[in-house]
């Protein structure tokens, strides 16, 4: 028998994914002058705790290596990311955000948080805290299961 709560979560997750399409983000972003396809690259480089590479960007974005490579190249061309020679292995390069990339990351964070804040505007502080706690735990568990295969 199907669990109605799990089905509701599935529908909500699909709706979130649809709302995060490139076209939807561009329409919402308005004055944020950044190709939404590069949002993921900025996020992936910024979130990496080790040295970011094209491989780590691909993993964080959930895309294959060739797609990540093309997106990283576009981010480099746009001046958002720079390639840096890895001192431990000269054949390898790592990625870091440029000053422009950091500025765009801050603007994107602000933009997203404004959208989320507006969506929760009528919620109590307790509801916001509980939602943040549950969503964070849910995402962590999904990530753990994804890594374990």
Annotated model-derived regions:
Residues 22-64, 78:
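N-terminal helix-turn-helix DNA-binding core of bacterial DNA-binding proteins
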Residues 40-43, 117, 132-133:
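A cross-family signal for key residues in well-ordered alpha-helices
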Residues 1-36:
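N-terminal leader segment of winged-helix/HTH proteins
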């Amino acid at each position: 028998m199907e669990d109605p709560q799990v089905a509701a979560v599935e529908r909500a997750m699909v709706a979130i994914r649809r709302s995060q399409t490139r076209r939807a983000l561009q329409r919402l972003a308005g004055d944020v002058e950044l190709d939404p396809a590069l949002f993921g690259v900025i996020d992936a480089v910024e979130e990496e705790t080790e040295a970011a590479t094209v491989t780590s960007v691909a993993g964080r974005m959930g895309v294959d290596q060739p797609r990540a490579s093309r997106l990283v190249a576009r981010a480099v061309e746009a001046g958002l990311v720079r390639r840096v020679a890895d001192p431990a292995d000269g054949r390898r390069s790592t990625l870091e955000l440029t000053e422009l990339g950091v500025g765009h990351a801050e603007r994107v964070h602000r933009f997203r948080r404004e959208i989320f804040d507006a969506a929760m505007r009528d919620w109590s502080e307790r509801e916001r805290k509980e939602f943040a706690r549950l969503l964070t735990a849910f995402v962590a568990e999904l990530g753990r299961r994804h890594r374990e295969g």
